[in-house]
Structures are given as structure tokens and as C-alpha cells.
Amino acid sequence: MAAAAAAAAATEQQSSNGPVKKSMREKAVERRNVNKEHNSNFKAGYIPIDEDRLHKTGLRGRKGNLAICVIVLLFILAVINLLITLVIWAVIRIGPNGCDSMEFHESGLLRFKQVSDMGVIHPLYKSTVGGRRNENLVITGNNQPIVFQQGTTKLSVEKNKTSITSDIGMQFFDPRTQNILFSTDYETHEFHLPSGVKSLNVQKASTERITSNATSDLNIKVDGRAIVRGNEGVFIMGKTIEFHMGGNVELKAENSIILNGTVMVSPTRLPSSSSGDQSGGGDWVRYKLCMCADGTLFKVQVTGHNMGCQVADNPCGNTH
């Protein structure tokens, strides 16, 4: 610093006497001294600090990615909420005058003012679904059955049939007179077909008695196999009893089978041989149907012409 001050004083003395020319070496030394002084003044307040040790502000790294995901998720939820709001607005038809499709009353009544498309309706406890006064309540299924269900009881209305399923039973009342038109409570009411119903289609029926009116016949028809079974026996009574079937008839009992009445067998459907056939020719085995005086039927194999029922092992005993 002293050398710099002396040089400055000498310069001032020389400058007072006029401009002084310096050599190249003196200029280089003076320039180097000025640069050193400038650099020392610049570094006087500088303290080098590592950037990793500085306090970081903002969201960086994983926190930044998580923040971006949260913002995108909130945006998607906002768009979905907007779409749901628009759909509800279009379906319910909310306008300046209120809701055009339904009305809410203080009594808890919800009234639909136009045709409504619904999937499943769950009425609350002790609630009622009905129509307006002097108007019909029309319920339509789009190519699907309409099902009314409460517990195990179910009413299904389809295109070609209506079925009712219940584990307890069912009763049909006249809404005006409250008279029972049809009931499955057989202990209290005798089972009768409703007026206008000509036939009853069931897969299995358990009852004590099946009867018909005095002026009509009782017809039991099945497509496959019919089984009539009684725990204490089966009794069939009628003026005329006819069995028509395409297969076999099997009468099976633990003790006995009693046919009390006139038994007729139509021979038109029984196979018969022509008069020219031989008695034992071919693969045919012929039998003759015989009957005892007490009505017992038995068969006798035909082994020759003009053969009768007088055989030794017939069940009639001495009476033929």
C-alpha cells in the first residue's frame, strides 16, 4: 500500500509539471496492481457455500410428482361430477319453475308427473305405490318380466304367462266386497277353481280328495308319466272311469287291487292274427284271454285250433 501511495504522490508531482509519458513496463505494472486491488475488494464479502446445503423451497422430486397426481385426480373428479350433474339436470328436468318430472310433498309423497323409466323400486316400510284418482297405473317391462316380490312371495308377469310363487300361501279378495275368491288355506277354505278357469296345471299336488262338478267330467291329462299314490290307499269312484294312454298301465298295491264294477276291455286295439295263419308258425306266440266266474282274468297259450280255456292250471278251480 505504501508503494502504491508513493507512486501516486510521484505521479501527482509529475502531473503538476505536465503530462508524463510512461514506459510499457510501468504501464503493465500499474495495470497489474489495479487488477489485484479490484479483485481483493470484490472478494472481501464473498463466502463460498455449497448449494446442496442451502434451504430448498417449493415441491421437488417425489413430492412434486405426487402433487401433480393429486391435481389431475381432482380435475377428473370435477369432470365426472359435472357430467353427473348434467345428466341429473336433463333427466329430472330442473328449470326456473322447479322440477318438471316429479313433485315432493311435505307428507312424504313423491309424485311422478310423466312417464318414468326405472329398474328396481324398493318401497319403504308400510309404503304404497299407486296411481292418480280415476287413472290407471300402467307398469310396462321392456322385453323383460315384471316382478313384484316381498320376502319369499313373488308375482311375475311375463308375455305369455303370469306366475305366483309363495312358501306360505295366497288369497285373492274382491276389493269391493272383501269376499275371498280363491285361497290356498285348505284347512279353512275348500279349494275351488275360480270362475272361468277350466284347467289347473301343476307338477305335483298333495290333497285328500279331487272331485269335479256334478255336471262335468274330471279329466287328468299328462304329457309323460302320471303317478297317483295314496298313503292309505287310492279310491277312484265315478259313473264311468276311462283310462287312455299310449304306454303301459301299472297298478301296484301292497295288499290287493279291487275292481268293483263292470270291467270292459275293447278288443279293437288288441293284436289279432288272420284266419290263414298257422297256430304255431313263425315267431308269433298267441294267447287266449279267459275269465273266471268271479271276474278273475288269466291267459292260456294257444297251441292248437279250437282250443278253449279248460286247462289244468287255471286259477278258477273247478269253475271255468
Swiss-Prot record:
Residues 23-34 have a biased composition (Basic and acidic residues). It is found in: Cell membrane, Sarcolemma; Cytoplasm, Cytoskeleton. InterPro entries: Sarcoglycan, Sgcb. Glycans are attached at residues 160, 213, 260. GO terms for biological process: muscle organ development. Residues 89-320 are extracellular. Residues 1-10 have a biased composition (Low complexity). Pfam families: Sarcoglycan_1. The chain crosses the membrane at residues 68-88. One of its GO terms (cellular component) is cytoskeleton. Signal peptide: none annotated. Residues 1-67 are cytoplasmic. It is a single-pass type II membrane protein. Its main location: membrane. Residues 1-34 are annotated as: Disordered. Disulfide bonds join 290-316, 292-309. It comes from the Eukaryota. The keyword Transmembrane applies. Keywords: Cell membrane, Cytoplasm, Cytoskeleton, Disulfide bond, Glycoprotein, Membrane, Signal-anchor, Transmembrane, Transmembrane helix. Disulfide bonds are present. The keyword Cytoplasm applies. Component of the sarcoglycan complex, a subcomplex of the dystrophin-glycoprotein complex which forms a link between the F-actin cytoskeleton and the extracellular matrix. Cross-link to form 2 major subcomplexes: one consisting of SGCB, SGCD and SGCG and the other consisting of SGCB and SGCD. The association between SGCB and SGCG is particularly strong while SGCA is loosely associated with the other sarcoglycans. Belongs to the sarcoglycan beta/delta/gamma/zeta family. This is Beta-sarcoglycan. It comes from Mesocricetus auratus. The gene is SGCB.
